[in-house]
């Protein structure tokens, strides 16, 4: 057994045990419209594969990617502003924190009312959820740069631009990747919430439609697909992080 398999073995054992308990519990309840078994969910996912993969998954991914891209631009911009000026930090930080006290399920219907059932109401929900961890984590990364190193470069005639790109950016990269790994699942959740509350397509919308039909397995099938997509995306980002930040210890 190689090292990777040994490292993942505890997680696989825990997951298998959880699924077995779920299977036995659902069989005991014997009410698939309330608690379907994992086997029933996988069967439903296979039955619905065509409509889920060709219609609803692309719709959800479009909202997720657009929302995450906007959150990245917004979060990075706010983090840099707060790092460069104490005035901007005092002005922006409380607003950023306050934005996370707004219940998503309360504001999402307003976005639908203002922007309709198109993509932008769901994108705004996604941005509202995801820009916060990006902003705060990247800001902490920028603040983690050692002042002594910056002062040393200044004595050699370095500009603020040099310090930013040669010290702050390398120090921030691990924080940036951590922010991305947090933001990906949150962006998918945001897209699903937006679709659940008001949409004409998407995995969140499809799950809600199955709920109205008392199809428990149909409700869970899109959720399983969303979870799989999120785990795959986070794994890819982690792989990219290992390649990009492997020189970190030498810096």
Residue ranges and their predicted role:
Residues 2, 28-69:
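Periplasmic/extracellular loop-to-transmembrane helix junction in inner-membrane transport proteins
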Residues 66-96:
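Transmembrane-helix boundary motif in ABC transporter permease subunits
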Residues 86, 143, 220-251:
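C-terminal transmembrane helix and the adjacent membrane-cytosol boundary/short C-terminal tail
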Residues 97-133, 140-141:
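Generic hydrophobic transmembrane alpha-helix motif, especially the helices
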Residues 113, 189-226, 251:
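Glycine-rich helix-loop "coupling/hinge" segments at transmembrane-helix boundaries
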Residues 124-128, 161-194, 226:
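Transmembrane alpha-helices
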Residues 142-148, 152-172, 212:
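Short helix-to-coil transition segments within interhelical loops
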């Amino acid at each position: 057994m190689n090292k990777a398999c040994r490292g993942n073995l505890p997680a696989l054992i825990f997951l298998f045990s959880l699924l077995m308990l779920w299977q036995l519990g659902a069989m005991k309840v014997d009410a698939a419209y309330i608690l379907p078994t994992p086997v029933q969910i996988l069967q439903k996912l296979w039955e619905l594969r065509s409509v889920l993969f060709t219609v609803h998954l692309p719709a959800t991914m479009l909202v997720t990617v657009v929302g995450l891209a906007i959150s990245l631009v917004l979060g990075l911009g706010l983090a840099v502003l707060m790092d460069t000026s104490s005035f901007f930090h005092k002005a922006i930080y409380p607003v950023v924190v306050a934005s996370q006290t707004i219940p998503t399920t309360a504001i999402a219907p307003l976005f639908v009312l203002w922007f309709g059932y198109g993509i932008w109401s769901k994108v705004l929900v996604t941005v509202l959820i995801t820009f916060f961890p990006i902003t705060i984590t990247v800001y902490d990364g920028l603040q983690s740069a050692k002042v002594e190193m910056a002062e040393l470069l200044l004595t050699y005639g370095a500009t603020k631009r040099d310090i930013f790109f040669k010290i702050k950016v390398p120090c921030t990269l691990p924080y940036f990747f951590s922010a991305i790994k947090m933001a990906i699942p949150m962006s998918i959740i945001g897209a699903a919430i937006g679709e659940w509350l008001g949409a004409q397509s998407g995995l969140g919308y499809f799950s809600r439609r199955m709920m109205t039909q008392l199809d428990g397995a149909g409700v869970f099938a899109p959720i399983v697909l969303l979870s799989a997509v999120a785990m795959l995306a986070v794994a890819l980002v982690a792989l990219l992080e290992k390649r990009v930040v492997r020189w970190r210890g030498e810096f």
